[in-house]
Amino acid sequence: MVLLDANILIGAFRPDDPDHARLKAWLEATLRDGVPVAFPALVEVAFLRIVTHPRVYRSPSPLAEAVGFLQAIRASGLFREAPWTLRARERWWAWCRDLGLHGDDVNDAYLAAVAAEARCPLVSRDQGYARFHGLDWLDPAAAH
């Protein structure tokens, strides 16, 4: 199983994303290879908020199209719920405290904790995940 960050979903969905072809191909290959994918509700919210936002895109995505993209992943038979456990919460708090995190970095620590406790790689274009000791993560846009 891999846990997807919103930026992977956005890149795979939006044709105007600079890494669209690579991220779409990666996501399609992952599902074709039978690898389960997960993302917490927070990632779905971020995805929908960003791709439909008129201040982010000149031509924001229609909500129905964006929801359809998420529903297709969920209906693939390979979608798994990302568990939010007490251990994940404690790891999240510890990383926030120990790394002195605030703002957007708190969200990153949350995703990292969910992935770490699920013992699966976090897939993101955000290089900042390297700071979370013990987290397995990868950036498919950087892979060659």
Give, region by region, the residue ranges found by the protein language model.
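Short beta-strand segments at enzyme active-site cores
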Residues: 38-41, 82
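Short, well-structured N-terminal submotif of metal-dependent ribonuclease cores
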Residues: 1-39, 54-68, 118, 144
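Short, flexible helix/strand-to-coil boundary loops that buttress conserved ligand/catalytic motifs
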Residues: 13, 51, 133-136
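Active-site neighborhoods of divalent-metal-dependent phosphate/nucleic-acid chemistry enzymes
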Residues: 78-123
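Acidic active-site catalytic centers that drive phospho-/nucleotidyl reactions
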Residues: 5, 108, 126
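Active-site-proximal, substrate-binding regions of enzyme catalytic domains
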Residues: 52-79, 86, 95-97
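Acidic, PIN/NYN-like endoribonuclease modules and their adjacent C-terminal/linker elements
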Residues: 1, 86, 112-144
